[in-house]
């Protein structure tokens, strides 16, 4: 599948980012995976060049499966025809982690951060993302935790949020996916995160009701701001022209 070209106008120019603890929020809405990836890559390049402060990207995907750099294709349990029958895309992802599913009903956040201006420690960054999710879930009465030696957030022995990141020159991309109210049957196409003994769950399965994703986003932003010591501000002056060709390949 070919990605739609993207124009993303850079309008936030900082004289210096080293003393600024601003983090811009960019909500892409529902987009194809390739479209989101183009935006992530462009924002990450701007961050490396210190043209913008940190950025927190939100997106929702149609049904798709991504396989990370450390993943095994054997953890994909469906063939191409089965995926096509159910309208599920498949992509190799330039991130850490194994295989995972994305789709409607997930809260997805991709922080693009320069860890040199926070803490140059990838392990601490991962644990901090987990705590953002754990604290957010606690706000809704869901008691979750991390598991030593495993990445992600868990309720008992079931995973409720997956994390897979990439770092380049200490700038992060990709991020986290929290299961709010997805159709969990789509996880049957894979061995989630390569862990055959673990299952998946969602906030809806635990609470028995649908939670407003906008409220989850609001609470997550509160905890993200506190844990990473960033002032979140909307990136209003961004123009994304999904139809104009030749803007960025």
Describe the role of every protein-language-model region.
Residues 70, 120, 164-166, 188-190:
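A short secondary-structure junction signal
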Residues 2-160, 211, 241-249:
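N-terminal lobe of the biotin/lipoate ligase/transferase fold
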Residues 185-249:
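C-terminal accessory segment of soluble enzyme catalytic cores
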Residues 73, 79, 160-180:
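Short, conserved beta-strand/beta-arch hydrophobic-aromatic motifs that form part
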Residues 109-111, 151, 163-165, 176-180, ...:
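A structural signal for short, well-ordered beta-strand segments
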């Amino acid at each position: 599948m070919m990605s739609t070209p993207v124009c993303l106008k850079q309008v936030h120019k900082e004289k210096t980012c080293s003393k600024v603890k601003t983090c811009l929020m960019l909500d892409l809405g529902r987009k194809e995976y390739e479209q989101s990836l183009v935006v992530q890559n462009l924002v990450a390049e701007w961050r490396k060049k210190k043209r913008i402060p940190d950025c927190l990207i939100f997106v929702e995907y149609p049904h798709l499966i991504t396989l990370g750099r450390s993943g095994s294709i054997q953890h994909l349990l469906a063939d191409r025809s089965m995926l096509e029958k159910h309208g599920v895309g498949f992509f190799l992802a330039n991130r850490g982690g194994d295989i995972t599913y994305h789709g409607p009903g997930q809260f997805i956040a991709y922080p693009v951060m320069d860890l040199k201006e926070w803490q140059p420690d990838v392990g601490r960054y991962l644990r901090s993302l987990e705590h953002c999710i754990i604290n957010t879930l606690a706000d809704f009465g869901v008691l979750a935790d991390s598991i030593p030696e495993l990445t992600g957030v868990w309720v008992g022995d079931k995973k409720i949020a997956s994390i897979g990141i990439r770092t380049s020159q200490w700038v992060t991309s990709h991020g986290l996916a929290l299961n709010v109210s997805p159709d969990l049957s789509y996880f049957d196409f894979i061995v989630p995160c390569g862990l055959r003994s673990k299952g998946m769950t969602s906030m809806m399965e635990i609470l028995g009701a649908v939670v407003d994703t906008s409220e989850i986003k609001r609470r997550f932003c509160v905890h993200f701001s506190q844990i990473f010591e960033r002032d979140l501000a909307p990136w209003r002056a961004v123009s994304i022209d999904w139809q104009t060709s030749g803007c960025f390949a």
